Amino acid sequence: MNGGILTTNGKTFKKAVTKTAILLAISLHLLSFNFIQLRAFMSGLDQNTPRPIDIRLHQASKLLEIKFDNHTECMLSCEFLRVHSPSAEVRGHGAGQETLQIDKENVNISAIEPIGNYAVKLVFTDGHDTGLYSWDYLYYCGQHYEAMWQDYIAKLEMAGHKRIDQT
């Protein structure tokens, strides 16, 4: 390469190099843009989603208390978080591959591990530890707790299972 002009066997390929360089630059830009979009989606880094400022586990009552930076709070039961785990084990790898979680009334959280600055990994007493709970997913769960819980109860009943209330 000499001043942006490629020569091979005495021939100059300035136009080819320029077109190739432009196409390569555009391809790299699109690849970079798509990767950034995918990474933001996968990691739960929606900039508009409130972030937790305090996460407390109340083991006796089996509740996870989360306070967000927009002054909202939520209390999510360990059972709720377990049956709504964002893991592939629970959600599957595509639509229709979900696995209904049953007999999780007594589950508790044994550990909370931070994952970067975008999520936590919850370790449950039944051994489940593959779900990464992003900030936007936790916020979504807090905002839609009742609807998600009722949907879960309906799915249990449709599958012929009964939840044993532990109150």
Segments (PLM) and residue ranges:
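Motif-centric detector for short Cys/His coordination patterns
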Residues: 33, 38-167
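Intrinsically disordered, low-complexity segments enriched in serine/threonine/proline/glycine
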Residues: 8-9, 15
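Residue-identity detector for glycine
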Residues: 3-4, 10
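Residue positions that mark polypeptide boundaries
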Residues: 1, 24-27, 38
